[in-house]
Amino acid sequence: MSLGPNLTDPQVAVLARQAVDLLDPELAIDIRPTPCSDPYNRAGGSWLVWPRIDGHRSFGIYVQGSWTPVRALAQLIDGLAENSSESKGFWSRPFPPCASGHRHPAGVDADTDDVVLRCPDTGDVVERIRPAL
């Protein structure tokens, strides 16, 4: 049985920074390991990533250590997409941005190597993002 890549603290930090930089490179990030409540989880740790939006932790994004870097980055971008537009600093700003002229956010998907941002209307690929590991 393969347990997967087992992400490490430094790798999660790199992926979190990469995702948050897409929203705003000036945002600080807090990252904390989460206690393992599952005694059968042998796949490594997990973390909560908190972008400090509007000067505080407004939401956390869960990352599991057994995920691939692509899945973890997709989760981080999707978590930002779901929550950032509800904050004062990014109110109603579509994230991740879709194609030029579109007012809605791109959808977040993943393939083997990249996070894929797609227009929800056309299905066209807006951007491919490779994890910076």
Model-derived features: positions:
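Interaction interfaces in information-processing and related assembly proteins
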Residues: 22-75
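Cys/His-clustered metal-coordination modules, chiefly Zn-binding fingers
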Residues: 64-133
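General detector of N-terminal leader/presequence modules that precede the first folded domain
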Residues: 1-36
